[in-house]
C-alpha cells in the first residue's frame, strides 16, 4: 500500500510538473512597437497637444500590441509622462516643470522608455515648432531648444546605455526634412520622417496612424514610414486644407553616399565659381523656399534635388552635368517615400523631399549653422561652397 501511494504521488507530481512547464514556456509575446512622443507644447501650440494625445487614444484598438508613451509639457503647466491606451490616458509620472529644449531631458525620456517599454521596434516623434537645421522643441519657459546635434547627442547616449537604435525619428514639426538634419542623425536612427514645408497646428493624423498600427502591429519600419507619409497628406487633402503640405521618409543608410556626391558637386562648383556663379544664382532662386517665422527668424532653404536639376540643365560643362546627375540619383535613393499637395498654387508643386540651407548672401547667413549641425559642417564641403559663392558675388 505504501508503494502504491508512492507511485500515485510520483504520477501526480509528474503531471503537475508537466503542466507547470507548459505554463512557464508560454511567455507573452514581445510588444511589437513602442511609439514615444516628445510633446513640447510649452508655447503657443499648447491647445494642440491634448488634442493629439486624445486622437492617439481614440485610434488605438483595445488590446493593441503597441506601447504609446507621451512626455507632454504644456504652457504654464507641469509636465506629465503618460501611457496612452484605447480611450484611456494614464499618468505614469508627474514631473513638474521640465526643460524640453534640453538634450538631457530628451535623453532621460528615451532611456526611460527603452528600459520600461521594450519592443521590437521604436519610433520617436519630436512634436513642436521646427526650424530645420536650427532644430526643434522650443521651450518658452527656458528659452532653449533642441538642435539636430543635441538630438544626436541624446540618442547616442540612449543607444550606448541600452544597445538599441531607434528605428524611426519622426518630426511633427515644420521644416525638418533637411539634408543637414538627416546627416546629423545618420548614426542614431534608420529612418527620418520630416517635411520640407510648414506643418499645420493639427499636425500628424494620430487617430488614423494608431488605427493602422493597432491593426498591423508587425509592420516593418519602412512600410510604417510610408503609411505615415501617405496618411498625413491624405488627411489634409480630405480636409480640403489651404496649406501646402509635404512629408518625406528618408533612408539614413543612404546618407553617406549622398554626402559623397554632394561634396563632389559642391567642390566642383567652388573650384569653378567664376563660370558657375550665374547658374548657381538662377538655380538657387528657382528652388528657394523662404519662410518668415516671426521671432524664430527667416529661413532660406532650397530643394536640393531641384537645385541640382537646374544646374544640370543650365551648365555647359559635362563634369557639372555628371556630378549633378549623381547627386540627384543619391537623393532619389535616400527619399523612399514622399507626397505633397499644393492647393494654393503659389509654389512649385514639384517637391523632391529634402531641402538644404542656402541664404541669398552673407548678411542673411547665420553662424549658428556651424553650431547646430556640427557634423554636417565639419564633414561636408557645402559651407565652403556658400562662402565661396558669397565672396564671388
Which residue ranges define each predicted feature?
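Short beta-alpha junction loops
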Residues: 41, 72-77, 129-130, 173-175, ...
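Secretory targeting signatures
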Residues: 1-28
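Structural recognition of the beta-strand scaffold that forms the well-ordered cores
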Residues: 34-39, 67-72, 122-126, 167-171, ...
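Active-site groove signature of glycoside hydrolases
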Residues: 113-133, 137
